[in-house]
Amino acid sequence: DVYKRQIFNLITGLKDPNYGEIIIDNVVSTKLPINERFTKFKLGLVPQYGGLIHDLTMIDNLKLVAEIHIKEKELREQKINKLITQFEFESLLKIKAKDLSGGQKKKLVIAMALINDPKILLLDEPFAALDILTIKMLQEIILNLQSTGEISVVICDHQARDLLNCVDRAIILSNGKIIASGSPNE
């Protein structure tokens, strides 16, 4: 768990490496201030827990994040409507986040992370505490996101078997050391 957190902290810039560099799009990200890293590299983060304001409705959670990232009202509304359709949220918009199922909450947090059209989407334990049907649904969402070729998805999860159906490359760490790397078939 500590190594997973360190990897995400290094990518997002919350922590600088002790040695070496983090390079994204041929730019040494560690030379940029942290606030510039998220915007320049268009990072999206889906935390293991949280990410929602539970007393707000689904639509209000989406609107809040959109207002932070998208200045023009018309563009905000277009992006929100696109995500509502993409994630099939139409019947859930007026439901408070606290009343959503675990899978619905996870889908909402992923949609919120996609508001700013990230180039890199970081998913922290996306399958934790979810039933098999919801896991399969999230795997499909991840595969669909990656199929566009416009986004890289980085997933940290303890359940490798859940990941192998939705990744083209896997790196397995044990005590901070790489013990396996390659395609899921390897």
Task: Give the positions of each predicted feature.
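H-loop/switch region of ABC-family ATPase nucleotide-binding domains
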Residues: D157-H158
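Conserved ABC ATPase "signature" region
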Residues: L75-L92, L143
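ABC ATPase NBD coupling module
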Residues: S29-G44
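Short, small-residue-biased leader/transition segments that mark boundaries at the very start
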Residues: V2-Y3
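Conserved ABC ATPase signature
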Residues: K96-L100
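Helix-to-loop junction immediately C-terminal to a conserved catalytic motif
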Residues: T12
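Catalytic Walker B motif of ABC-type/P-loop ATPase nucleotide-binding domains
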Residues: L121-E125
